[in-house]
């Protein structure tokens, strides 16, 4: 059955609680190529009507490498010889120093990210101490991505003043076993649930281009919707030498932009943040992310790969009229 993106757009525009279903999302994803630009234009209208203001997010790789998980895309997995940087947990002072530099660069949000399945008690204390100091010394909204949480850990982070917890599902449940076999999909959903129950905003997304089907992209977006994500980060695979996906072909740029647009149809009011891989996949179309429905951008470096110049990103956003 065909679908008219403009009709669906009007329905969502008229009702802030309306959104595309998984079935509608798949039909949008399977529209012929000549419908891509009208689809993107509709996503832009939905973003303008329902999403929050544009924002930027920056991260620090607080503990790098030696992760016991075997995620097939990840440079930090101990299962693969990738040559990625390895270092133990940064101390509180170093985390605050990174935050100060990124605040000066203009970031709105700051994420503390660690490799590994879950944080050790002392690492959790370090993050909590850093969050307190970052809130006292900067305008940044502090976030953390530390792996799986316990109820006690989630409560500690919230008490310290953390605003948002990031935990990706990575891909659809039906494709997850092709990506990771060292933990179960439901463990990730449980961590997202614990973060929300602790009073934290939830940042939950995934990676496109792992070999999943369009139907599985719609499935992932539907699961994120059921997790009630406040922010949806969209990463685009950058193949890493030494990982099982090192020879994966990149998504075509307009396939990636079309998927971002469809995510906006499914998440009209959520923040949609385009993060890792945009330089590799989108190339000259990297400025199209906001036109395609996103309202957030990760700036600066990623976990193990260099990002675009922060100054260049802010210049691009100002020229687009997204930021002043």
UniProtKB/Swiss-Prot annotation:
Biological pathway: Cofactor biosynthesis; biotin biosynthesis; biotin from 7,8-diaminononanoate: step 2/2
Keyword Nucleotide-binding: no
Domain Radical SAM core: start-end pairs: 50-278
Cofactor comment text: Binds 1 [4Fe-4S] cluster. The cluster is coordinated with 3 cysteines and an exchangeable S-adenosyl-L-methionine. Binds 1 [2Fe-2S] cluster. The cluster is coordinated with 3 cysteines and 1 arginine.
GO molecular function: 2 iron, 2 sulfur cluster binding; 4 iron, 4 sulfur cluster binding; biotin synthase activity; iron ion binding
Catalysis performed (reactions): (4R,5S)-dethiobiotin + (sulfur carrier)-SH + 2 reduced [2Fe-2S]-[ferredoxin] + 2 S-adenosyl-L-methionine = (sulfur carrier)-H + biotin + 2 5'-deoxyadenosine + 2 L-methionine + 2 oxidized [2Fe-2S]-[ferredoxin]
PANTHER family, A to Z: BIOTIN SYNTHASE (PTHR22976), BIOTIN SYNTHASE, MITOCHONDRIAL (PTHR22976:SF2)
Assembly notes: Homodimer.
Role summary: Catalyzes the conversion of dethiobiotin (DTB) to biotin by the insertion of a sulfur atom into dethiobiotin via a radical-based mechanism.
Annotated family: Belongs to the radical SAM superfamily. Biotin synthase family.
Protein name: Biotin synthase
Organism: Oleidesulfovibrio alaskensis (strain ATCC BAA-1058 / DSM 17464 / G20)
Lineage of source species: Bacteria, Pseudomonadati, Thermodesulfobacteriota, Desulfovibrionia, Desulfovibrionales
């Amino acid at each position: 059955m065909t679908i008219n993106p403009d009709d669906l757009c009007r329905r969502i525009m008229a009702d802030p609680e309306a959104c595309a279903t998984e079935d509608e999302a798949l039909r949008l994803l399977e529209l012929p190529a000549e419908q891509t630009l009208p689809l993107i234009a509709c996503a832009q209208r939905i973003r303008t009507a329902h999403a929050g203001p544009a924002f930027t997010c920056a991260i620090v790789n607080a503990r790098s490498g030696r992760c016991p998980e075997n995620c097939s895309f990840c440079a930090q997995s101990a299962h693969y010889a990738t040559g990625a940087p390895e270092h133990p947990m940064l101390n509180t002072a170093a985390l605050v120093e990174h935050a100060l530099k990124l605040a000066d660069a203009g970031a709105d949000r700051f994420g503390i990210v660690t490799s590994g399945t879950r944080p050790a008690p002392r690492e959790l204390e370090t993050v909590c101490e850093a969050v307190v100091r970052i809130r006292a010394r900067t305008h940044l909204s502090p976030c953390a991505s530390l792996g799986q949480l316990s109820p006690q850990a989630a409560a500690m982070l919230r008490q310290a003043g953390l605003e948002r917890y990031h935990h990706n599902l990575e891909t659809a449940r039906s494709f997850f076993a092709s990506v990771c076999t060292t933990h179960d999909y439901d463990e990730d959903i449980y961590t997202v649930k614990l973060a929300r129950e602790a009073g934290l905003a939830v940042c939950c997304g995934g990676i496109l281009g792992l070999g999943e089907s369009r139907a599985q992209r719609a499935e992932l977006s539907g699961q994120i919707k059921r997790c009630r994500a406040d922010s949806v980060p969209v990463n685009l695979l950058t193949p890493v030498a030494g990982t099982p996906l090192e020879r994966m072909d990149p998504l075509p740029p307009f396939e990636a932009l079309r998927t971002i647009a469809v995510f906006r149809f499914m998440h009209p009011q959520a923040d949609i943040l385009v993060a890792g891989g945009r330089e590799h996949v989108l190339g000259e179309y990297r400025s199209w992310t906001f036109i395609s429905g996103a309202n957030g951008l990760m700036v600066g470096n990623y976990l193990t790969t260099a990002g675009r110049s922060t100054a260049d990103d802010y210049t691009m956003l100002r020229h687009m009229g997204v930021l002043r």
